[in-house]
From Swiss-Prot:
This is Kojibiose hydrolase. GO terms for molecular function: carbohydrate binding; glycosyltransferase activity; hydrolase activity, hydrolyzing O-glycosyl compounds. GO terms for biological process: carbohydrate metabolic process. Optimum pH is 5.5.
Length: 681
């Protein structure tokens, strides 16, 4: 296999010259005649606001706001809150409302390159309507929908934007005003409410944006339905053969983001309105163009190209730089997993983002750093030293796992996962100042935890007892392979960090790491835990010692473990990450057929129509599973691409193999130097 590395920034845009197969357009996912009975929404997001599509025209199913949690109908722990729908629009022609049943030629399309969701339809013989909405990438709390109406006959339209306070919010107040001066008139439809316990205030504000000047724009009417609902609307007569365009702009923000969300929501809406549609779209597209400087291009497998780009799109959509936000397993695609942060971030989503966009990965690890004190408190109340990160984390950093799940008290490997991510960030970026200020406190505190967590046995070995494994079907077991492996790496990396910074680390860290128990069964296979015999497992565990931990490097051992545990994964009710690890390891073993088989098995059985969104399990109906996307992207980048985080710092390329039907794999914008890697047969 030939491998080429370019040190300059290289960006290649693969264009599809024909739309003969929508399913294989490298940048667009399309749905003709969306069927509400077989429809799983697509998400448009900017790392702060997520908008989930609806099969109904001019509607969205749900809006998700990152960073705001409260207790609501999901046990006694916090969760994302059902929020205001900013894009709740009604359109009528000559008094007849647009509905799914009275339109023709209905199509929806996600433009991944530009972060835009578009719907189009014909309303009887009167007009063709196209609408596109955006979670504006440069304005994290703002969205926009642009509507274009092309008339075939004279018609009069009525457009209404409805703000309804969801039942999850309390003590709502509704406001309407016109901001008027000599050159503009900006109508503001605003609602303010509190989360269920009153912990946070949420504010939303909408306005219409017209191409006409102040004197020609339609009159805006305000209507109060009841205490929970109000709307603004306008009428407009349009001549046959004309195109009429308008936009709806909205802002959504909470007291978790800023002290005064009510005023700031209105300020942001006014700002966006006066920026104007063209400037907003230009800035939005510039931001997406910048994101796509880091891309994956596949030649020879059009469907794989589209699917991989969809995975990139979703991870880019669910994250953003210069924040302390970190994605949940479902990203911003809904309320799944309560919006909590798990190990899914550090082990599955963080590595591809670290290589593609270190500045975004920095936000993910910043999330953990800001909650380090909470992790110290958890360690203390469980009788340990240092810092013990929660299995499920939200805004405070306290444990948020429902009490009926044993993972909250016993799945301790997440602490090592956080430390590993911190060290990887330093290796890729070489940011020594960050390492001193934030990386070292994380690595030191987590190493102190493991030093107090291990138990020395009669043989002088160190054991870690009574945990829930990465294979979560194994509860309250001793010496879980992956948990012990993360402890080893955590202690080793903390010692290395101390050396880099010229700090003296406790000698016991290295001594303990060298003697933590990793055992084998009589057949030579790495044993998942002390009481493991031959049970089925929920997900990869012992195999993770080969990657990402790289504690097992012998190829025969890696293959032995693969061939054993790949037979222990049931075909249903197991999460999508496992097969991605199998694919990655087979790529590095240069077994092309097995690598490609597990690559496809990692996500294709999990796809849902019409946009091929990924669910957590095979046949599942809970997309979008961004954890699975992160795993598959690692199979492509670190597996087929052979990219690897060098223990000495930076990114290197190890021996790997492409699928036989892939002619070429190009990975652009890697690391802080934005390198390009090209692989061919």
């Amino acid at each position: 296999m030939k491998k080429y590395i370019f040190n300059h920034v290289f960006f290649f845009l693969m264009l599809c010259g024909s739309n003969y197969l929508y399913s294989q357009d490298p940048w667009k996912l399309s749905a003709d005649k969306p069927d509400s009975n077989n429809y799983y929404g697509e998400t448009v997001a900017n790392g702060m606001i997520g908008i989930i599509s609806s099969p109904e025209p001019l509607k969205v199913k749900e809006v998700v706001l990152a960073g705001t949690y409260d207790i609501y109908k999901r046990g006694r722990v916090s969760s994302f809150i059902p929020n205001y729908n900013l894009l709740n629009m009604k359109l009528a022609f000559n008094g007849e409302s647009v509905q799914t049943y009275n339109i023709n030629n209905y199509k929806q399309e996600l433009d991944m390159r530009n972060g835009a969701f578009t719907g189009s339809f014909q309303f009887k013989d009167l007009a063709t309507v196209t609408y596109s909405y955006y979670a504006l990438r440069h304005l994290p709390h703002c969205i926009m929908m642009v509507v274009n109406i092309n008339t075939q006959k004279d018609t009069e339209i009525n457009v209404e934007n409805l703000l309804e306070t969801p039942s999850s919010l309390n003590n709502q107040q509704n406001y309407f005003q016109n901001i008027t001066n000599t050159h503009v008139n900006i109508p503001l439809l605003t609602s303010v409410a509190f989360t269920p316990t009153g912990r946070s205030k949420i504010a939303v504000s909408n306005t219409f944006l017209f191409d006409e000047g102040k004197k020609l724009q339609p009159e805006i009417l305000h209507r109060m339905n009841d205490a929970d609902m109000h709307a603004m609307s306008f009428d407009k007569k349009i001549k046959a053969g004309k195109t009429y365009s308008f936009a709806l702009i909205g802002s959504l923000i909470s007291s978790d983001h800023i002290n005064d969300p009510y005023n700031e929501a209105e300020r942001l809406t006014i700002y966006a309105a006066l920026e104007g549609k063209s400037r907003l779209l230009n800035r939005h597209m510039q931001e997406w163009n910048s994101l796509w400087q880091s891309d994956i291009q596949v030649e020879g497998d059009p469907q794989a190209q589209q699917d991989i780009r969809s995975m990139l799109y979703h991870l880019y959509s669910f994250t953003r730089k210069s924040t302390s936000l970190s994605p949940s397993p479902m990203g911003l695609s809904g309320l799944g997993y309560n919006g909590h942060v798990f190990w899914d971030t550090e082990i599955w989503m963080f590595p591809p983002m670290l290589l593609l966009h270190p500045e975004i990965a920095k936000s993910m690890i910043e999330y953990r750093y800001q909650r380090l004190d909470a992790a110290r408190k958890k360690a203390a109340i469980y009788g340990y030293d240092g810092a013990m990160f929660p299995w499920e984390s939200a805004d405070s950093g306290a444990e948020e796992t429902p009490v009926n799940a044993l993972t909250g008290a016993f799945e301790h490997h997440v602490t090592g996962d956080v430390a590993i991510a911190a060290w990887q960030y330093y290796l890729v970026t070489g940011d020594k100042e960050w390492l001193k200020e934030k990386g070292w406190p994380i690595l030191k505190a987590t190493a102190e935890f493991w030093a107090s967590r291990v138990e020395k046995n009669d043989k002088g070995e160190y054991e870690i007892k009574n945990v829930v494994a990465a294979d979560e079907w194994a509860e309250n077991i001793d010496n879980n392979a992956y948990t012990n492996g993360t402890a080893i790496r955590n202690l080793q990396y903390a010692s290395k960090c101390a050396t880099v910074l010229g700090v003296i680390a406790p000698k016991e860290w290295t001594l303990i790491a060298d003697k933590i128990l990793i055992s084998k069964m009589s057949n030579g296979v790495t044993r998942e835990h002390d009481s493991y015999t031959d049970q089925n497992i929920k997900q990869a565990d012992a195999n993770l010692l080969a990657y990402p931990l790289k504690l097992i490097t012998d190829k025969e051992q890696i293959e032995r473990d693969l061939k054993y545990y790949q037979t222990k994964i049931p075909q249903s009710d197991t999460p999508a990450m496992t097969q991605a690890i199998f694919s990655l390891l087979y790529s590095r073993l240069e077994d092309s057929d097995q690598a490609y088989h597990w690559f496809k098995d990692a996500y294709q059985p999990n796809l849902n129509p019409p946009f091929r969104v990924i669910s957590e399990c095979k046949g599942g109906t809970n997309p979008y599973f961004s954890t699975g996307a992160g795993g598959v992207l690692q199979a492509v980048i670190m597996g087929f691409g052979g990219l690897d985080i060098d223990a000495a710092g930076g990114i290197k390329q190890v021996k790997s193999v492409l699928p036989k039907n892939w002619k070429k794999l190009t990975i652009t914008g890697i690391g802080i130097e934005k390198k390009t890697f090209v692989l061919t047969h």
